[in-house]
């Protein structure tokens, strides 16, 4: 099952939701503002990142700039606690399943969440 972590006001989040819905891909939606991610959720996501916290922290967010914190000097537990307290620190949307992770919306990359049969049929239809 696909988990879509988002905030409703985020344009990229709305695009990701619309894309998944239009391709009839089942997903569970998690509003990170009303249902903050647990530290276990965050740890699970971090295990799938290529660059660790760098991939999930939005250094351009207003919250990040207001906090003026150096994430490189935080322990992982301190960082997870901070993100749990301030979910707007996260880049969004976060889309994940058992094999894939995507941070942000990218129409080419989100295709990885399509079932293999769907992708195969789509490829065959472009060859004809």
Curated annotation (Swiss-Prot):
Instruction: Tell me which GO cellular component terms the UniProt record holds.
Output: cytoplasm
PROSITE patterns per UniProt: ARSC
Q: What InterPro entries does this protein's entry cite?
A: Arsenate_reductase-like, Spx, Thioredoxin-like_sf, Tscrpt_reg_Spx/MgsR
Q: Which GO terms describe its biological process?
A: negative regulation of DNA-templated transcription
User: Is Transcription regulation tagged as a keyword?
Assistant: yes
Q: Which Gene3D superfamilies does the record associate with it? A: Glutaredoxin
- The set of disulfide-linked cysteines is 10-13
Q: Which UniProt keywords apply?
A: Cytoplasm, Disulfide bond, Redox-active center, Transcription, Transcription regulation
List the CDD domains hit by this protein, alphabetically: ArsC_Spx
Q: Which residues form a coiled coil?
A: none
Q: Where in the cell is it found?
A: Cytoplasm
- Tell me, in one coarse class, where this protein mainly resides: cytoplasm
Claim: Glycoprotein is one of the keywords in the record: no
Q: What NCBIfam families does the annotation carry?
A: arsC_related, PRK01655.1
UniProt function note: Global transcriptional regulator that plays a key role in stress response and exerts either positive or negative regulation of genes. Acts by interacting with the C-terminal domain of the alpha subunit of the RNA polymerase (RNAP). This interaction can enhance binding of RNAP to the promoter region of target genes and stimulate their transcription, or block interaction of RNAP with activator.
Family to which the UniProt record says this protein belongs: Belongs to the ArsC family. Spx subfamily.
For this protein, the record's HAMAP family field holds: Spx
* Subunit relationships: Interacts with the C-terminal domain of the alpha subunit of the RNAP.
Q: Which protein is depicted?
A: Global transcriptional regulator Spx 1
């Amino acid at each position: 099952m696909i988990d879509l972590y988002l905030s409703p006001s985020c344009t990229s989040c709305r695009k990701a939701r619309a894309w998944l819905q239009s391709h009839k891909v089942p997903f569970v939606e998690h509003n990170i503002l009303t249902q903050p991610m647990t530290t276990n959720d965050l740890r699970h996501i971090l295990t799938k990142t290529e660059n660790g916290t760098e991939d999930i922290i939005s250094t351009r967010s207003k919250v990040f700039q207001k906090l003026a914190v150096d994430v490189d000097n935080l322990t992982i537990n301190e960082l997870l606690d901070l993100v749990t307290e301030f979910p707007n620190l996260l880049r969004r949307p976060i889309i994940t399943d058992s094999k894939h992770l995507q941070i942000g919306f990218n129409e080419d990359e989100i295709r990885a969440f399509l079932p293999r049969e769907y992708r195969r049929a789509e490829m065959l239809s472009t060859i004809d």
